[in-house]
Structures are given as C-alpha cells and as structure tokens.
A protein has these predicted regions:
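N-terminal, charged low-complexity regulatory/assembly segments
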Residues: 1-217
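Solvent-exposed beta-strand sheet faces enriched in polar/charged residues
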Residues: 324-326, 340
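Residue-level recognition of well-ordered secondary-structure positions
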Residues: 40, 226-229, 340
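Short amphipathic alpha-helical patches
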Residues: 43, 62-67, 189-193, 197, ...
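Extended mid-to-C-terminal alpha-helical interaction segments
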Residues: 202-319, 327, 332-335, 347-352, ...
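Residue-level detector of alpha-helix boundaries and kinks
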Residues: 23-24, 268, 338
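Charge-dense, low-complexity intrinsically disordered segments
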Residues: 26, 262, 340
Length: 362
C-alpha cells in the first residue's frame, strides 16, 4: 500500500475561485439560480464577461494558490497578481494545471508570444488535449478551443481585465463573504485534523467528502487537504506537481446556508427536496438493500440513464448516498461507479430537521 504524507492548508483564496466557478453553474451545485445571477449582476457587463470566460481558462488554480503567502486570502490574491506583468498573469494561473496538459500550455505560450493564432495551433491544441486524456479532451472541446486561443493571443488584455474584474468582485461581494466564512474554514480544518488522528485515510476522505468511498489511497507521496465553504458537500481535486495532490473538502456547517441571511440550512433544504421525489425514494430503498451502478438502477426503474444520473446527483448533493469510486471506466469499458445509501446522511437529515424546528425564530 502506498504511504501518503498528509498535509494541510487553509485560506479564503480557494473559495474566491471556487465561488466564481459555482456562481457560473449554480444548478450543478444546488444553488438558487436567481441569487447567483443577482451576485453576478453587481458587476459591470465587461467585468461579468471576463469572469465568465475566465472559467474556461483558469478554473481553480490550485498550484498557484498553494504557493501564495499567508494569510492566503483575496487581498493576497489581488496583490500577488498585481505584481506580475499583465501578459504573464494568465500563464502564472495556468502553470501546473492538471486540466491542461503541458504540451497544450506550450502551444498556448507560443500563441501568447506571437499575439495571434493559426489553424495549425488549433489543430495541435486539439491533438495535445486528446492525447492527454483524463478530462483534458472535454475541457478542450471544440467550442472552447477558439476562446482559449483568442484570450491567450491577447494575454496582456486578459491580464488587465481579469485583475480589474477580480477586484470588482472582491469589492461587490467577496470581501464581506470571506469575513463570514473564514471562521467556518478554521473550524472545519480543526475538525478534519481531529478526524485524521483517529481514522485511516480512506475513512477520512469518505467522511470529509460526505460519501465518496475510494477503492485505494491516492497514488501520490503527499496529499494536501484544505477546507472550502463553497464546495460543500463536494470535493474539488487538483494536482500540485508531480507526486502531490490537493483536495478541497466541504467545511460549511450543517446548520448554515451558502446564501447569506438564509434561515433554512442548505443541507436540510437539499435533503428535503431530494426526499420529496418518489423516484429518489425508490432509489434510496434499492440502494439500502445493495450497492448498484447507474446502469443497474436504470434497468430496475425502467428509466433512461441521464434521468437516473440526475436523480443520483440530487441525492449526492443531499449527502444521502455513498459513491464508491474504483476506476471510472472498468476494463470491460463499463462505468464501475457504485452507489449505496449513506445511513449517517439519512440520520443527519432528521437531526437537522429536529434542530431547525426546535431552534425557533431568530
């Protein structure tokens, strides 16, 4: 068995980028679309445009964030970016990215140096992403290639506009947000470290991810765990170079909400929504009896696979199912993910509901 050294990190800088990612695809994370649109609407149109397009360029720049000095917050992000020449900011954020293969980055750097791109660059970039596999081909899909190339050809313009947009986002929303979430991050870190002292690594990862059960420990020498308020209950994965991986784990308390001032906790609301659907209740009953793949569930329910996947995603966001991860694609080419009911998640729903009802008005 691989021996993995466990490291820890904390800072609101991670949530600065995670929050932007989630605000641009709220439905995937169970966030109210209208509220997310309202946050984005606080920015000027040109600021919204560059932040939206940056999600296909920057994502969550794990390697760059990890190297930031303390206290690793939004102010440090903005200051560090401001110290770089504008044309180098995009390259700095993407350096070490695990979604964009090194050969693709080399092609894009050449585009940045020339200030333009040719059809041959597009073809070479598509080949580099396809050969890399592991999600890179999806991230470099045909509709994204032109956007990637256009912005890399205008790296200096991107660097100026992106920093200005990040500052505007900080002023309009995130400065207040990071003051709200910072205590929860440190509490989540302390709790995770306490769990790490008494659980083995696989059990720890399952607990912190609210139901992801890995078949084996990561094949890395070092694993960095960092709390994230916005990612709860999901995990964000990234690489920090050869042999070192980072995972953001959810640190939002069960009685808290992602939307500031919202009375009903997110975890409770997601769970009650999930349980209000008869198909999802049937799925939970099947998964209580045995673990099943999405394809097996589709056959039992006589539903199309995408429909079953949608229901499983809702149950996963509610923390009601365990997802057992081996190889995503088995040797026979079939999806090997298996789901099971998460008993502790079901118990948490009833405990949370009872606590909410007994709490009374604030």
């Amino acid at each position: 068995m691989t021996t993995v050294r466990l490291l820890w990190d904390v800072g609101t800088a991670y949530d600065l980028f995670v929050s932007l990612w989630i605000l641009h695809q709220p439905a995937d994370f169970g966030l109210h679309r209208a509220w997310a649109a309202g946050v984005r609407a606080r920015l000027l149109p040109e600021e919204r445009e560059v932040l939206e397009q940056s999600q296909e360029l920057v994502h969550v720049p794990f390697s760059w964030i990890y190297t930031l000095p303390e206290p690793k917050d939004a102010s440090v992000v903005l200051w560090t970016l401001s110290q770089l020449p504008a044309r180098e900011r995009l390259q700095a954020l993407v350096a070490g990215s695990d979604w964009l293969p090194p050969t693709a980055v080399d092609i894009l750097r050449g585009v940045a140096d020339r200030g333009r791109w040719e059809d041959s660059d597009r073809e070479a970039l598509a080949v580099a992403c396809r050969d890399a596999g592991s999600g890179a081909e999806t991230m470099c899909s045909a509709k994204r290639l032109d956007s990637l190339l256009d912005w890399w050809a205008r790296s200096e313009e991107f660097g100026k506009r992106y920093l200005a947009a990040l500052r505007a986002y900080q002023d309009a929303f995130f400065a207040e947000e990071e003051r709200r979430i910072a205590p929860a991050l440190h509490q989540g870190l302390a709790r995770a470290q306490e769990l790490a002292a008494r659980l083995d690594l696989l059990d720890l990862l399952e607990e912190l991810s609210h139901g992801l059960r890995f078949e084996a420990v990561p094949e890395v020498s070092e694993l960095v765990l960092a709390p994230s308020y916005w990612s709860t209950p999901l995990m964000f994965f990234g690489m920090l170079g050869s042999g070192r991986e980072i995972r953001l784990f959810g640190a939002r308390p069960l009685d808290a909400s992602l939307v500031p001032g919202e009375v009903v906790p997110d975890a409770l609301l997601q769970a009650l929504k999930a349980l209000s659907d008869p198909t999802r209740l049937r799925i939970l009953r099947y998964l209580t009896q045995e673990s099943l793949t999405p394809a097996e569930l589709a056959r039992r329910l006589r539903l199309r696979a995408p429909t079953v996947t949608h229901h499983l995603q809702a149950l996963r966001l509610a923390g009601l199912v365990q997802l057992k991860l081996g190889l995503l694609i088995a040797d026979d080419g079939k999806d090997s993910r298996r789901y099971a009911t998460r008993p502790e998640g079901v118990k948490e729903v009833f405990d949370s509901l009872r606590a909410f009802l007994e709490k009374g008005d604030n």
